[in-house]
Amino acid sequence: MSSRLGAVPATSGPTTFKQQRSTRIVGAKNRTQCSIKDNSFQYTIPHDDSLSGSSSASSCEPVSDFPASFRKSTYWMKMRRIKPAATSHVEGSGGVSAKGKRKPRQEEDEDYREFPQKKHKLYGRKQRPKTQPNPKSQARRIRKEPPVYAAGSLEEQWYLEIVDKGSVSCPTCQAVGRKTIEGLKKHMENCKQEMFTCHHCGKQLRSLAGMKYHVMANHNSLPILKAGDEIDEPTERERLRTVLKRLGKLRCMRESCSSSFTSIMGYLYHVRKCGKGAAELEKMTLKCHHCGKPYRSKAGLAYHLRSEHGPISFFPESGQPECLKEMNLESKSGGRVQRRSAKIAVYHLQELASAELAKEWPKRKVLQDLVPDDRKLKYTRPGLPTFSQEVLHKWKTDIKKYHRIQCPNQGCEAVYSSVSGLKAHLGSCTLGNFVAGKYKCLLCQKEFVSESGVKYHINSVHAEDWFVVNPTTTKSFEKLMKIKQRQQEEEKRRQQHRSRRSLRRRQQPGIELPETELSLRVGKDQRRNEELVVSASCKEPEQEPVPAQFQKVKPPKTNHKRGRK
């Protein structure tokens, strides 16, 4: 029988020494290879010449007469994690040794208990010991049942608000929120103690920011006003200016009002009317002494007087309305009240300015009295054609569809994007049936085709009369204008009268003049003579005549040129 690795077949009869030697070598090789395959780590020993009389029956089976291998010590095998070889083998060609099977988990655990370091070297990582479950974490996972409160109680309302919004605010201060009813109750026990109290006046405030603002606004190193004391306006304005500079805004001090302002005037205007009824507010209204129009603020009344009635006129104290008295007493930017002498000086300056303005009226045009719009210009516009509602509706529909309208007159190619533009065009279109009028100048009755033409005519030809005096100007200014016109008319009349009288005198020289006129003429002649004397005295003194011997003799002029005979 031949082996799997090509062993030499056994022969009958006597064998030589060489044959026995080769047989022993081949058998040893076969046994070594078989032991490597089975992972037994067994070492084979050669057979003795005397004992081996025949060839091995099989390459993988040991000789039955003598043990073919010996085992290492058990300690050495355990140190290298090697299991000792099994004593029995599975017979047959397809049999597999049980040595190659993996050890059960129980044996590995036992080996690990005996040699933990070796276990760590083999597996390459440290195995963590199993942790036991924490009983506290399991207890926390247990969901608590929702608390039950009495129906309609405050606790139930707070609980519903927490479920809805996530927190509930303190009903006392409305500034602190809690997520649980127990926390809210604990806060409410000390809620009154947590409020900030001003050590100046004892006022309780909800937050630290509110306390800081209160101290800054009311106790800013200034004397505190008590009941019955009058407010010093310059001091109050200075205090408000400091608060506004530091905090950036002024808040109303009333508890029910949360208004804030960024200007001192707005704050003072609000404080005067905050918390007052309609009857009190009506008494505080200021009325214009010209037209009686009511205003809620002095600034509004002052603007009305400047825009509608010109500059504010200064009246004596007896005839001045109360509202204007209050306005005149209003403090200026420096905090000083205007004195009476200053008011009188301003009044005289205003009169002088009005007189100068009246003198320069033809040269200078005041901004209010210039003609910025067409209603003040002295010209008339022609009438525009009328259109039916159906035509207008059709034009509007065309604009929505095509975004343009064409002139309906035949031969006209004008296109417009609005109904008003088409209307203005039809008023001046020459291809239509409508005969448009012309623009007429009311100063000289001249007609123009276009509006720009009549405007240019008025601005250039009637430069002094092109504006209309504003009827709402001040009465004092109108009086000055009338007085100036009367003076100019009187001067013109006097000049005309003088010119007529001088002409009459020239035409009638033989008529004797009355004594009054003679005296006037004599006085005039005397004045003329005196003026002549004064002018003569003012002139340089005449030079004395020089004797003839000292005078230079000038050669007579000749018509001959030099160098010619």
Curated annotation (Swiss-Prot):
GO terms for molecular function: DNA binding; zinc ion binding. Pfam families: zf-C2H2, ZNF512_C2HC, ZNF512_zf-C2H2. Residues 12-23 have a biased composition (Polar residues). InterPro entries: Krueppel_C2H2_Zn-finger (IPR052274), ZNF512_C2HC (IPR048408), ZNF512_znf-C2H2 (IPR048403), Znf_C2H2_sf (IPR036236), Znf_C2H2_type (IPR013087). SMART domains: ZnF_C2H2 (SM00355). Residues 118-129, 494-507, 554-565 have a biased composition (Basic residues). PANTHER family: ZINC FINGER PROTEIN 512, ZINC FINGER PROTEIN-RELATED. It comes from the Eukaryota. It comes from Macaca fascicularis. Belongs to the krueppel C2H2-type zinc-finger protein family. Residues 484-493, 522-531 have a biased composition (Basic and acidic residues). There is a cross-link at residues 18, 83, 226, 332 (Glycyl lysine isopeptide (Lys-Gly) (interchain with G-Cter in SUMO2)). Its main location: nucleus. Residues 1-30, 85-147, 484-565 are annotated as: Disordered. Coiled coil: none annotated. GO terms for cellular component: nucleus. Keywords: DNA-binding, Isopeptide bond, Metal-binding, Nucleus, Repeat, Transcription, Transcription regulation, Ubl conjugation, Zinc, Zinc-finger. May be involved in transcriptional regulation. This is Zinc finger protein 512. A zinc finger (C2H2-type) spans 196-219, 286-309, 405-429, 439-462. It is found in: Nucleus.
